[in-house]
Swiss-Prot record:
Pfam families in the record: ANM3_C2H2_Zf, Methyltransf_25, PRMT_C
Record-linked CDD domains: AdoMet_MTases
GO molecular function: histone methyltransferase activity; protein-arginine omega-N asymmetric methyltransferase activity; protein-arginine omega-N monomethyltransferase activity; transcription cis-regulatory region binding; zinc ion binding
Acidic residues: compositionally biased ranges: 18-45
Protein keywords: Cytoplasm, Metal-binding, Methyltransferase, Repeat, S-adenosyl-L-methionine, Transferase, Zinc, Zinc-finger
One Gene Ontology cellular component annotation held by this UniProt entry: nucleus
Subcellular locations according to the entry: Cytoplasm, Cytosol
Protein name (database record): Probable protein arginine N-methyltransferase 3
Active site (record annotation): E383, E392
Length: 620
């Protein structure tokens, strides 16, 4: 993201360098100013400032020399009492960072941070700001999401100036230290600390570890001795950790978007007829929805959904993708097919089909890249689904786009999603293969492979005949109304042996649980032609396959009418279970874009006895 004109570069903010002198590269003056600037860093803006400092107000263009003067201005002019919010919510340092970034993001949208009302200009917003109302959403503050750890403004000097959690104003060496009075080798301690802090902000968490483990500094002249790790305040380390957390998310995002830069995965997705034709039919088959509509395509990839939307008669299509490579490809594809919007072309020269603009950005940052239409979008379309529906966690970006860019009552496609589960038999494992390899018994290998599968989920296509139980619904999502926290859920369900799963002996072994999903383009929005996209093992296979979770040990099952009452352990050949009661939790993992799955399993016999197996934890 380009540096905004009204923002200062971080070196200028911290070291107090004059902008022109910095750009002219006058090294001698820089060295002097660097030493002087360290005192400014230590005092952290104790001097009250006017409008010409480096700290930008959260609501208007006023600037200040200190945090206290800035927040005093916010309280008196904008009715935003930062310190009161901190006190009443009991926020820690990271909460303060999130709050500042949250407020800045809302102000950028001309939206009241407290009540959410939207205005047409910043002046109208500032005229509206009212007495403190701390918004709560289901008992949580709306800035609690870790996405707000990432600075909304590039090089936001206010984040480096927060002193609300500072314990004291003295240096951490335990004694007054004059400028240049303590050195480390050939460089000053100030320079070393400043350099390390810059490295933390630039490099991430690995540098934080080095920073905290830094060895003791020994002065050459005996004036001062102390740990370098003690010199910068806890506040600076917290800023570094917050920055590193945001950078960690960015790093995963870059890897994620980079993985979609390969044409192989797009070839696979485009070649998935179930997937592509479902979107095609929903977009082309519903003219009352699409004709003249403004459309936002989140995660556009090659641009295929945008092309369908344009062909369906959309008046404007904004295609968004986080991969620079795919944005370039989608732009070229769109241009080659005569759908690319060219703002430099005269209106009389444009064809009605030239409606697509491709933008390189994440959905959460779209309004920083382009001017979002004032009346927002009529239709939001995205192919966001991952393995087990929620892997990759792209759904959060779609929900963000829905809440910020879709007009009230606008259509989201697809608008429903449902996760299903069922038990599978021996054919769903690799055991049959290893039991007869060119006439040789290698079942010992099969058992080891199956044991490994009990620790890791497997994405594969199962044949419908390998499903031995009835199907259960784990969870359903209404994408038009759901909240982001609903992506984390726990579901309890029961599995009974299906008619097709009954074996000749009467006992069938269930080796685990398989999950799949359907997404619906329902008649809520697709009135002429509703469409259902299914990844079920009973339907045509898709590139999503199914997600397989193998039990630590298989469970014997039988129909209730044929089950034998026995004192043996439930789930064995002697006492098969007539029902498996399972509880599955799926939550977003600490690793960005991953999910954690826990499975609790209980077998119930025909006489009501129960046997529970240890909880299994999987990461996808």
């Amino acid at each position: 993201m380009a540096t905004r004109e009204h923002e200062l570069r971080p070196e200028q903010e911290r070291l107090g360098e004059d902008r022109e002198e910095y750009e002219d590269g006058e090294e001698e003056e820089e060295e002097e100013e660097e030493e002087e600037g360290w005192d400014d860093w230590e005092s952290d803006g104790d001097d009250a400032g006017g409008g010409g400092g480096g700290l930008l107000c959260l609501f208007c263009s006023a600037r200040f020399d200190s945090e206290s003067s800035l927040f005093s201005h916010c309280a008196s002019e904008h009715r935003f009492d930062f310190y009161r919010v901190v006190k009443e919510t009991g926020m820690d340092f990271y909460g303060c960072i999130k709050l500042i970034n949250f407020v800045r993001s809302k102000v950028a949208e001309n939206k009241c941070w407290s009540c959410g009302q939207v205005f047409s200009s910043n002046s109208e917003l500032c005229g509206h700001l009212h007495a403190l109302e701390i918004p709560q959403l289901e008992g949580k503050v709306p800035w609690g999401d870790d996405v707000y750890l990432k600075p909304f403004l590039e090089d936001d000097s206010l984040l480096h100036s927060l002193s609300v959690f500072d314990d004291d104003d003295e240096d951490d060496c335990g004694m007054p230290m004059e400028k240049g009075g303590c050195s480390a080798g050939n460089g000053s301690l100030a320079e070393t600390c400043e350099s390390n802090l810059k490295s933390i902000i630039n490099d991430g968490s690995d540098v934080i570890d080095r920073f905290e483990r830094t060895c003791t500094i020994e002065s050459t002249d005996g004036e001062c001795s102390g740990s370098l790790a003690q010199e910068p305040s806890d506040k600076q380390l917290k800023i570094a950790r917050a920055s590193a957390a945001a950078r960690g998310i960015n790093s995963v995002d870059e890897s994620y978007f980079g993985s979609y830069s390969s044409f192989g995965i797009h070839r696979e997705m485009l070649g998935d007829k179930v997937r592509t034709e479902a979107y095609r039919d929903a977009l082309l088959g519903n003219p009352s929805l699409m004709n003249g509509a403004t459309v936002l395509d989140v995660g556009c990839g090659t641009g295929i959904l945008s092309l369908f939307a344009a062909k369906a008669g959309a008046s404007r299509v904004i295609a968004v993708d986080g991969s620079a490579k795919m944005v370039s490809v989608a732009t070229e594809v769109t241009k080659s097919n005569g759908f690319l919007y060219d703002e430099n072309m005269e209106m009389q020269q444009k064809r009605d089909t030239q409606v697509i603009t491709v933008v390189h950005t994440k959905a959460e940052e779209l309004n920083h890249k382009i001017q979002v239409p004032s009346n927002k979008f009529d239709v939001l379309v995205s192919e966001w689904m991952g393995y087990c529906l929620l892997y990759e966690s792209m759904l959060s970006s779609v929900l963000y786009a829905r809440d910020h860019f879709l007009k009230p009552g606008g259509a989201i496609l697809p608008d429903t999603a449902t996760i299903f589960g069922a038990g599978f038999g021996k054919g769903g494992t690799s055991l049959p293969f290893w039991e007869n390899v060119y006439g040789f018994d290698m079942s010992c290998i099969g058992k080891e492979v199956t044991g490994n599968s009990a620790r890791f989920p497997v994405v594969d296509i199962l044949a419908s005949e390998d499903i031995v139980t009835e199907t259960a619904v784990l969870n359903s999502f209404d994408l038009a109304t759901m909240k982001e926290n609903e992506m984390d859920f726990t579901s309890s369900f029961e599995l009974r042996l299906s008619e097709s799963g009954v074996s000749p002996s009467g006992v069938t072994w269930c080796y685990g649980i398989i999950l799949w999903f359907d997404t619906g383009f329902t008649n809520r929005f697709c009135k002429e032609k509703p469409v259902n996209l299914s990844t079920s093992p009973f339907s045509t296979p898709t590139h999503w396959s199914q997600t397989i979770f193998t039990f630590e040990e298989p469970i014997a099952m039988a129909k209730e009418e044929s089950a034998v009452v026995s004192s043996a352990s439930v789930g064995t050949d002697e006492c098969p279970a007539v029902m498996i009661r399972s509880r599955i939790s799926i939550v977003r993992a600490s690793e960005h874009r991953s999910i954690d799955i826990s499975i609790e399993t209980t077998g119930i016999s025909s006489d009501g006895r129960k046997r529970s197996w240890p909880v299994q934890i999987f990461n996808l």
